[in-house]
Design a protein with these regions (language model features):
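Non-catalytic accessory segments flanking P-loop/AAA+ NTPase cores
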Residues: 1-89
Length: 89
């Protein structure tokens, strides 16, 4: 994760737990793409810390649509309520 932005500790823990649920052969690229996207969102808004909404937005942005179902299930299993950020169940 980038040096210019910091991650909220709880958000970072949830991010790493989400990454663990991704198939091993996709983990590396998923971790890189989603973390860069979350940090990019924060940077564009001139903030310094990645929060849960940024992480959720990044996962929805970087995950191919066909995998949104399993991704949503993984988020629900970790107690991440993506619906509060405007995404449908």
């Amino acid at each position: 994760m980038g040096a210019s932005v910091i991650w909220d500790k709880t958000t970072e823990e949830k991010f790493l737990r989400m990454i663990e649920k991704i198939p091993v052969f996709l983990r590396g690229i998923a971790k890189e793409k989603v973390s860069k996207k979350a940090e990019s969102i924060v940077g564009k808004e001139n903030r310094a810390k990645v929060c849960e909404k940024d992480m959720v937005d990044a996962f929805f942005s970087e995950t191919p649509f066909g995998f949104h179902g399993p991704m949503k299930s993984d988020m629900e299993a970790l107690g991440i309520d993506y619906t509060q950020y405007g995404y449908k169940r």
